[in-house]
Amino acid sequence: MLDSSSGLKDTGTTATQALTITVASGDAEATAANLTSLYGKTTVAVDASAVTQITGSVAEANIVYAAGASEITGLGNETVVTTDTSLSDVTTLNTLDGNTTGTVNAASVNSITGTLAKLLTAYGSNGITGLGNETISVSDTGAGSSLAASDLNSLDSKTSGTITTANGLATLTGTVAALNTAYGSEGLTIEGDEAITISDTTVDAEALNNLNNYTSGVINADTLTKLTGTLADVNVAFAADAASSATI
C-alpha cells in the first residue's frame, strides 16, 4: 500500500520541489489521500500509471481525478473502493464513476441522498457496484417538483433498503397502476399529501378509489375518458370528485 510520501524529504528551502515521482508497481493499491499528498510535494506531474486501485472517500477520490494531468498522470482505468458510509449527494458518486473506466465499488455506502434522476443514474450504471441494500432519501422537493411513479418503482426494485421521498414534493405522476404500486410498496415511504396527475384514459373505479385513499392531495384525472367498475365503486369515485377539486 502506498505510504503517502514518507520516504520523500525536502532537499531545499521550499516545501514543493521539482521532483519526478513515479508510483511503483508495488504500490498498485493506493489511497486517494496519499496520492493527493504526493502531487502536493512536487511541481512535476506524478506518474501513477502503475496504480490499479484507489481507496478512499468519494470526495477524496474525486480530488485526485480533478487534479488533472498537470498534477498526476496515468489514471482513468483503475478500480475505486469507497470508504463512505453515507453520501449526502449521489451526484458525487456519478462524477467518480465518470472519472474511471474501472469499477467503483460503493459497498461501504449504507445511506444515500439525491434527486431521483441522479439516483437512477447511479443505480443504473454498469460501472458502480456494491449498491442494493442502502437507505435512500429522494431530495426532489418544492414548488414544481414532480416525480414519475414508474421511476420510483424502478428505484425501489434496485434496493432492499427503504426509499423516502422529501417533505414538500409537489406532484406524483403516472398511471393509476404505477401510482398504486408506489404507494403500496413496503420499500417506499411517500408523504401522502402530494397532488396526483394520472395519465390513463381508461381506469377501473376501484383502483382509482384505492389511489384516492393513499393521498390527501388532489387527483387530476383530466386525461380520463372512461371509468369502469361496479356501480358502487363508480359512485364512490364521483363522490370523491364532488368533495374535492379533483377532475374526473
Where do the PLM segments sit?
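General marker for long, soluble alpha-helical cores
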Residues: 1-248
